């Protein structure tokens, strides 16, 4: 009913209403309505996340570069790289002819994170009683403020997916690395911060799971609606940058 009313208003004002427009209208309504939530209340999601932060026993201690396990500093270039040649490398760059920058023409030199083939940043989407929900996780990273931030279903570099670290393949990776997956809602390469990363981009994805498919969800994952994600963005250092990037498509 609401979608049809908005559609009529747009058409009366000369807008071209196509399938993409209808999808955008549905997404807009999805992002502003709380009564559609079918699983967890917003308060429950906030309390769940805060509890996960309290339960996290990860500690982070700053150490010297030479004390890093399995990371090497080149004696010739000073570049820092992993012994597997995966993950990333710290290189130096010289930037010149920077007329449009604050420093003027002289340019500058700086270290950059390079040789990172990128990875997959993916959100699983599943409809419960017809309402889209997104599977997110409370993920700990050593550089996070508060240790944990709300992250996508899958946040994995190519090295992670190839198990270069010797560990397990990330959970739910099978939903995102299937080339013939017909349930892909969105899949595009998007660049990282070019001031810190050298020629890096990640494959941002939203993949829909069939409503009748049962998933085994660990307790550090939770289903949330788009409305809830938008509300959680009002809380400082709660929603990580990768989720913010993916949902910008919606």
Labelled PLM ranges:
Residues 134-195:
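An exposed acidic His-Trp-rich patch
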Residues 90, 134-136, 154, 205-208:
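Generic structural hydrophobic/aromatic packing signal, biased to beta-strands
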Residues 95-155:
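Core of folded catalytic or high-affinity ligand/protein-binding domains
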Residues 1-99, 234-250:
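N-terminal domain-onset segments
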Residues 60-118, 122, 173-190:
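Extended, Lys/Arg-enriched charged tracts that mediate electrostatic binding to polyanionic substrates
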Residues 187-250:
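Elongated scaffolding segments in large macromolecular assemblies
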């Amino acid at each position: 009913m609401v979608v049809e009313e908005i559609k009529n208003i747009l058409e009366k004002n000369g807008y071209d209403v196509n399938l993409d427009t209808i999808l955008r209208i549905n997404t807009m309504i999805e992002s502003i309505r709380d009564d559609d939530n079918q699983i967890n209340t917003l308060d429950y999601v906030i309390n769940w996340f805060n509890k996960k932060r309290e339960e996290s026993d990860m500690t982070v201690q700053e150490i010297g570069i030479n004390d890093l396990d399995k990371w090497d500093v080149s004696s010739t270039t000073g570049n820092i790289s992993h012994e597997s040649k995966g993950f990333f490398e710290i290189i130096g760059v010289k930037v010149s002819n920077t007329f449009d920058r604050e420093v003027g023409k002289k340019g500058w030199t700086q270290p950059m994170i390079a040789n990172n083939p990128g990875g997959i940043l993916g959100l699983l989407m599943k409809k419960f009683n017809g309402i889209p929900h997104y599977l997110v996780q409370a993920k700990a990273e050593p550089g996070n403020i508060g240790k944990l931030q709300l992250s996508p279903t899958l946040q994995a570099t190519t090295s992670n997916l190839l198990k270069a670290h010797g560990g397990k393949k990330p959970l739910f990776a099978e939903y995102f690395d299937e080339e013939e997956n017909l349930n892909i809602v969105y899949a595009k390469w998007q660049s990282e911060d070019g001031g810190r990363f050298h020629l890096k981009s990640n494959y941002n994805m939203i993949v829909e799971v069939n409503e009748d498919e049962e998933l085994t969800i660990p307790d550090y994952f939770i289903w949330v609606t788009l409305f809830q994600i938008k509300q959680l963005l009002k809380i400082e250092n709660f929603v990580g940058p990768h989720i913010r990037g993916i949902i910008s498509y919606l």
